[in-house]
Amino acid sequence: MVKKILNLILLGAIAFSFTLCSSAEKKEESAPEPSGQEQSAAANRSVDVNSPQAIADSLNDKLKDFRYPDGLTRPGFSYKKADVNAGDFSEWSKVNAPVIKEGLGKLPDSYALEITGHTDAIGPEQAEGDKKGNIFYSELRANAVKQALIKQGIPANRITTKGAGSSEPVSGLDAKDAKNRRVTFRFATSAPQQ
């Protein structure tokens, strides 16, 4: 008896959802055709998949999981350090440097690889007394990885660096976890070189 009642309720819910879907389709069908100006504006808003920004977005999708240290073979940078281990970085770059080189090859010179250094949430964000602060260490890490990438053949003028301090912890980790001491990568328009 209970099973029959549950089946009836389930059938009713399914029928109700079909009713809602069919009424939404009717509303879409009855929408007026956009004017010529509206169609032109919509066409201008559409993204050209060959535009530099679309290419950068696609490449950034690949880069979103890139980080150094990788978090697996080495959890993160040592505390208050920007230690790029030559052997470790060499292994990391075998996989990741080709993607970076490919991206820079596809993008105009106005785009660069942006390396962002990160820290854990231990210590102050800005310099305080004799403490240099997380921003300092995150910038130091980004610059250390930049130098290592230059040695791998990435042009220095196509790399920018910045420090985020502890403001962008790895999702799902405690802000004080060592895995937050890392650098991340993305392609972005670069500021003019001076």
Question: What positions do the PLM features span?
Answer:
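N-terminal targeting leaders that direct proteins to extracytoplasmic destinations
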Residues: 1-71, 83, 90-94, 98
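Short coil-to-beta-strand
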Residues: 61-75, 108-117
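Envelope-exposed proteins and targeting segments
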Residues: 71-75, 80, 109-111, 155-157, ...
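Periplasmic peptidoglycan-binding/anchoring modules of Gram-negative envelope and division proteins
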Residues: 81-123, 146, 150, 185, ...
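Periplasmic OmpA-like peptidoglycan-binding domain that tethers envelope proteins to the cell wall
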Residues: 119-194
